[in-house]
Amino acid sequence: MPFDEKYFSTHTYANVTFAKYSMYWWSNRFYATLARRYGRKGARLLEVGSGMGHLIGSLEDTFETYGMDLNHWAVKQSKAVIKKTNLQTASAQELPFKDGVFNVVIIKHIVEHLPDPKKALREIGRVTEKGGTLILATPNLDSLLKPWKGDKWIGYQDPTHISLKHPDEWSYLIEKAGFDLVDIFSDGFWDVPYVRFIPKQIQKLIFGSLGGFQAVTGWVFLPYRWGESVMMIARKRK
């Protein structure tokens, strides 16, 4: 399936709202907190797969921001609302940037869509400066509650998820791309419902409270198996 306007209206994005205080608003705020924590103020930051530009736009006040996406439509939409960020259409597997120019690279829920994520991570390693930071997130095949969902697990619902891997496989590819893993954690259990006969809203409180607390506070504490996404922080070797 092509990554065009139809993709954003029929798959994961179809029911997504980025309104203030929504789940995705808090999620982007959390990623922005991580970028500011590990990045150098005023340095260049790249988001690979910037989509509609919600995350990269929130970082314009801290970094010299760059965003790229394979989706022409998404880049066009982003340009209509983001004014400072350098946005362009490009492939994650062939980044149109010089070597070692970025202090921070964010690739959030993109690698699972790529036919060759190994090549994409090598490209990210190439454009990241020595000592720079990679922030990566992808569906977590080792999630403790994934067996409860079976075939209905969120990671299986998008047919473009063609490169799902276990966290140890991702960490291996990241290290082969020239990075050292700094931290690995998760974003909590948000793929409700997990059990029958309990109202969905109650399950959000039961299962989602820890992930919500982590997102709101910016305090990273959830073990990597305690959630539907695995998140990795890595540092480019000097």
Region annotations inferred by a language model:
Residues P139-H161:
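Short, glycine-/aromatic-enriched active-site segment of Class I SAM-dependent methyltransferases
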Residues P115-K119, K146:
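Short N-terminal helix/helix-N-cap motif within the alpha/beta-hydrolase-1
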Residues M1-K98, V104-K108, L121, F185, ...:
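Conserved N-terminal segment of class I S-adenosyl-L-methionine
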Residues G132-T138:
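Conserved beta-strand signature within the Rossmann-like core of class I S-adenosyl-L-methionine
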Residues H109-H113:
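A short His-aromatic
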Residues I162-A177:
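Short alpha-helix
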Residues K149-G150, D183-K238:
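A C-terminal cap/extension of S-adenosyl-L-methionine-dependent methyltransferases
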Residues K118-K130:
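A short glycine-rich, Lys/Arg-flanked "PGG" loop and its adjoining helix->strand segment in the class I
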